[in-house]
Amino acid sequence: MSSSPSWVVLKFGGTSVSTAARWRCICEQIASHLAQDDATHVWVTISAMTQVTNKLTAALQQASRPVAGEPSHLELFRSIVLQHFALAYDVGLLPSLDGGLSSVDQHDRWQDKWLRSTLGDDGFAPVVIDAVLPTALHPLLLEFRNLYRILEGVKLTEEASPRIQARVLAFGELLSTHLGVCIMQHLGLSDVQRVDARQLLVSESSAAKSDEDRFLQAEVLPREDVARAVEASQRRRVVLTQGFIGSTKDGATCVLGRGGSDTSGSLFAAMLRAKRYEIWTDVHGMFTSDPRYVPDARLIKSLDYREAQELAAMGAKVLHPRCIEPAQFAQIPVEIRNTNDPNGEKTVIQPSRDQDSGSPKILAVVRRANMTTLSITAFDMCGTSGFLAKVFAPFERFGISVDLIATSQFSVTVTLDHIPGGVGGAPFKNLLRELEHDAHSKVQVFESCSVVSIVGRRLRKSLAELGRVFDVLEGYDVLLLSESAEDLNLSFVLQQKNADEIVARMHKYFFSAEDATAVQRSTAGTTSSIRRTSSRDSLLGPTWQTLRGSPH
């Protein structure tokens, strides 16, 4: 084995780690990487099994403030236990029991042993793990026990602080990796080490404005520390670790927020100076629009870091925008690949090559839903120094981040994505009170808004052609229009019920093959069009419909 391993980091999401078939694909991919040469090592970061994080969130709610008619925290806990049992059983981790039992009886007998080894007869009584259960599974069963005890503690105290919430939410990844390492060994990957991500990913507490930020939206700065990561790996060729979770400087568990597993994988890639970071999911990459609503959206084959970050921030859900920064920090290529089509098309994110000589290009039309818009009007604003500082001070004070901004002589309009506690929570109510009383402003609140964004490069160079997009908006109320300072997106805020239709019409304008042909005829020999540049077309792959119908 080489003394200087070359690392590849793979990240698999919840759907990719929830079935036996998907785990076989994961192990095949790992084996394929290992077969390249003796120096290649593989660092695997995985999420919780599908829906487990949602169940943990609901269990916290039901343990602290039960809602009548909803599953209890114990029922949700049992569902999580059985979900992991089903996977262990399907993979074949549980051997055949003696006694000539039918397959149904075998399953039921193992399920009973699994539950008894997790819960016992009394919530706080010591549990003896059934001796028939394989020893390799004992850490998983004990982790279930830890989760149950914490949920019972929440039930007794009737409260769950952000610190306790983070501890509970982290169990999804802790459980999936306990089971995952058993599956990998069972499927032939013997040289594998499970690593606790909390040993390596330590949050930057100085960035936290509140306990919610510190424990539930933790920030971990990218760094290179190959020696520490290799030490944690115990020099095994394969490492399995958790996405989403980390620790504070005093050793408490924290989580990186939803989508944090992408960021975890990127942080590990930077730490290891990996040669590549692969995000494995259930789609082929990033598309020119959300293919769930625009089936003829085309795959974007290549992006630079900033383009990918902007697409993710403005609505592309394939990856989290924060995951780009660590990869960019270490200049590591990122690939988005489909677990169901491992040798198929993909999106590659890499350093900018800027081969299009400064020409404008449109990359995608995307949207974000469930936004809140505030319009703040004050007639004493005009010409008043410090007015904007006064308006925005309460946002910082109550931990509410502003997304898009548009200003005039007498008003400021902003969009809000994440509001702690939602629009009915205390932070938002306090914000409105301060804006209306202390800033002497009239505040209008528009809920259920969507932001529709045209994402690209050097958009201002094609304002004349972009102006035709406004025809699509005729008859709709646009609450805000914003063009980014970096010239990367043009965004419109409107009521959510209209967003899907507008996105589809804008996408057709920019990416339809029929429209592109018409543009080529009408502009041939006179002008170029952002809808027919060769540099952009070379970046685009097949449509979603084509890829979905391709053989795997």
Regions found by a protein language model. Give the residues of each.
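Glycine-rich beta-alpha junction loops
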Residues: 49-50, 199, 283-285, 334, ...
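A conserved regulatory-domain signal marking ACT and ACT-like small-molecule sensing domains
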Residues: 345-552
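Nucleotide/pyrophosphate-binding catalytic subdomain
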Residues: 2-319, 323-324, 493-495, 514, ...
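Structural motif
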Residues: 6-8, 40-44, 85, 191-193, ...
